[in-house]
Amino acid sequence: MKLIVGLGNPGEKYAKTKHNVGYWVLDLLAEKLALSFDQKTENGIYVKQPDFILAKPTTFMNKSGDFVEELIKFYKINTQDLMIIYDDMNFEVGQAAIKTTGSAGGQRGMAHIIEKCKTKEIKRLKIGISRGKNAKEYVLSPFLPKDNAKIKLVIEEAANILIFYLSNSFITTIEKFNANKNKV
């Protein structure tokens, strides 16, 4: 069973911030699949299908690993079937990257997931948000109007890639993503 987790911070205060692009991708993915996040735990919300789970932690970003660990243990999911979607300041707005391993790159939600899963071998779809002067203030602010079209396009493409991934292998998904990379 595949587990796809979109990272973000809970609450209306953070809903439109750069740090919540993982939530945005999951929301669009669920909408495209006509699904709703109808299951809830203390640490998050999710929707379970026979072959996959879409999940959003409702803890703050730096505690995202608690919910991921909870779902992995309860549903006996192998970390090889886990994919995390999150914001990355190392990529420009409008860029995205799929990785199979690596450090958290300063992203605290991903760092907590790596800590809880005890491995860096976690698939991830990183959504570029560019870099600001003060990282904390920057990620907790909305995109500039000039970036709205780019971020909307990359969120759409990310959701489409995940739809493809749900019924294909990760390798096939990477090949398709890389073939279309210049379009994102």
Swiss-Prot record:
Its main location: cytoplasm. PROSITE patterns: PEPT_TRNA_HYDROL_1 (PS01195). The record marks D87 as: Stabilizes the basic form of H active site to accept a proton. It is found in: Cytoplasm. The active site is at H19 (proton acceptor). It is an enzyme of class 3 (hydrolase). Keywords: Cytoplasm, Hydrolase, RNA-binding, tRNA-binding. GO terms for biological process: protein quality control for misfolded or incompletely synthesized proteins; rescue of stalled ribosome. One of its GO terms (molecular function) is tRNA binding. It comes from the Bacteria. It catalyses: an N-acyl-L-alpha-aminoacyl-tRNA + H2O = an N-acyl-L-amino acid + a tRNA + H(+). Its EC number is 3.1.1.29. The record marks N9 as: Discriminates between blocked and unblocked aminoacyl-tRNA. GO terms for cellular component: cytoplasm. TRNA binds at Y14, F60, N62. PANTHER family: PEPTIDYL-TRNA HYDROLASE (PTHR17224:SF1). Monomer. Belongs to the PTH family. Hydrolyzes ribosome-free peptidyl-tRNAs (with 1 or more amino acids incorporated), which drop off the ribosome during protein synthesis, or as a result of ribosome stalling. Catalyzes the release of premature peptidyl moieties from peptidyl-tRNA molecules trapped in stalled 50S ribosomal subunits, and thus maintains levels of free tRNAs and 50S ribosomes. This is Peptidyl-tRNA hydrolase. It comes from Mesomycoplasma hyopneumoniae (strain 7448).
